[in-house]
Amino acid sequence: MRVLVTGATSLLGGAVVERLVARGDDVSVFQRRSGPSGLSEHLGDVADRDAVDRAVHGATAVIHLAARVGVTGPWSEYEAANIVGTQNVVGAAQAFGVRRFVYVSSPSVAHHGASLVGAPAGPADPDRARGNYARSKAQGELIALDADSPDLAAVAIRPHLVWGPGDTQLIGRIVERARAGRLPTVGTGAALIDTTYVENAADALVAALDRAPEIGGRALVVTNGQPRPVREILNRIVLAAGLEPSRVRIPYRIAWGGGLIAERIWERRGSDRDPPMTSFLAEQLGTAHWFDQRETREVLRWSPAVTLADGFDRLAAWFSSIPPTAGDIT
């Protein structure tokens, strides 16, 4: 296949590209800044339709990872990248005869704030999704799946909490907060969460690309299928980075309410940095969110190759390999 990968400089995007190249696909990438891949590279912003058209032209398949991520920031930035950008990539795919389209979504598109215990992949709901990122990704998912047709097989994959060596998003933010003393246990820390090691997520996206003609129009959540208490996950990440876990505990209601206040203060200030706590972060740290993976594994004919234990061993080895001056991966 001639596959275009958008957002290829991200941790997950890079892992996807590696797999496609290794198996012999003709891969090109679309991203905002140049990377070291050595592949056919298109530079630009997904909000620029002309740039998107140039990138998509000639591709027979697209994996769309490019997105504005984060828990804070102006709606206009999320809208431009995650809604307008998706409209542009989907529109170009339709215009240039692309046959397979994988939209990389998030379980947050169907999360309304309550605990998720063995949950299925519920429908994306922009009206109830929590925060600008989730709302914009929900709208993007609807745009992508609405394009599914006999001519273009479109599927949405929702990897949950992707992490691995070199990660500047989930791992980077956790380590940054731990170093600053801003990583408390919210509630008891016993809520179960399920994460996804980056190589497993990449394998699932490639499987979705291969199965797209059979599963077009569907949304699937992808995880390691190994729920663990949130405190255990955080502690293992912090220990892998050579830091001591925090012993500070904050009741859930206090963390949630304080986070809501902090969000409003930071919004009024126009700060581009995350507040010490947000209501969404409190929900992520204080409520369960793990998913039934039976349908995903059956439909994709995929299963995780890297266990949590192996992933944490690799993470610790990576932290040990980087110079002390490079220890701040954010």
Residue spans for each PLM region:
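Catalytic helix-loop patch of NAD(P)-dependent Rossmann-fold dehydrogenases
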Residues: 84, 114-162, 183
